Amino acid sequence: MKKILTLAAIVLAIGGCSGQQAETQATPVNIKSLAGDSAVTDIRPADAMPVYPARGKALERSFTDQPPLIPHKDDYKITLDKNGCLTCHSWDKAARMKATPVAKSHVIDDKGTLNGHNYFCTQCHVAQAENKAPLVENKFSTQ
């Protein structure tokens, strides 16, 4: 009985696929851009490259208890398995790499094991570069 049902299912599957023909006279699809029919006429020059502070120089903090700013790019990968910041800033590599070691407030033992609450560095620490044009107006005041 199983063989007959299996054979019938195969015949129906093949029969269902074999009688169809591909549509050869398909009409082209006209997709419009979000910009409509307007052409791009204004080509602007590329943005200036950001200038980071000199190596080994700490950036001045704007307010008390502000996390230190990162004086370099901050696109190092941070995943559950690996923290890219620790390739330079871990306690055992910081002196050799001439980098600031992870603060004692961020570790849980004398070996420099990072506390899980401080694992994702870019939650608090941000890269700072001297960009020529501000992206948004800044009304911050230290007073």
UniProtKB/Swiss-Prot annotation:
One example GO MF annotation: metal ion binding
One GO location term (cellular component): periplasmic space
Subcellular location: Periplasm
SUPFAM superfamilies hit by this protein: Multiheme cytochromes
Main localization category: periplasm
UniProt: heme c 2 binding residues: 106, 121, 124-125
Protein modification: Binds 2 heme C groups per subunit.
Position of the signal peptide: 1-22
Biological process annotations from GO: anaerobic respiration
Keyword terms of this UniProt record: Electron transport, Heme, Iron, Metal-binding, Periplasm, Signal, Transport
Induction and repression of expression: By nitrate or fumarate under anaerobic conditions.
Positions annotated to bind heme c 1: 72, 85, 88-89
Phenotypic effect of disruption: Mutants exhibit 15% slower rate of nitrate reduction compared to mutants for other genes in the NAP operon. Mutants can grow on nitrate to maximum cell density earlier than wild-type. Nitrite is not detected in mutant strains but ammonium reaches detectable levels sooner than in wild-type and accumulates to same level as in wild-type. Double mutants with deletions of both NapA and NapB fail to grow on nitrate or reduce nitrate under anaerobic conditions. Double mutants for both NapB and NrfA reduces nitrate as fast as wild-type.
Superkingdom field: Bacteria
Xref: PANTHER family: PERIPLASMIC NITRATE REDUCTASE, ELECTRON TRANSFER SUBUNIT
Function: Electron transfer subunit of the periplasmic nitrate reductase complex NapAB. Receives electrons from the membrane-anchored tetraheme c-type CymA protein and transfers these to NapA subunit, thus allowing electron flow between membrane and periplasm. Not essential for nitrate reduction but confers advantage to the organism when grown on nitrate and thereby a fitness gain in utilizing nitrate.
Quaternary structure (record): Component of the periplasmic nitrate reductase NapAB complex composed of NapA and NapB.
Family note: Belongs to the NapB family.
Protein's recorded name: Periplasmic nitrate reductase, electron transfer subunit
Organism placement in taxonomy: Bacteria, Pseudomonadati, Pseudomonadota, Gammaproteobacteria, Alteromonadales
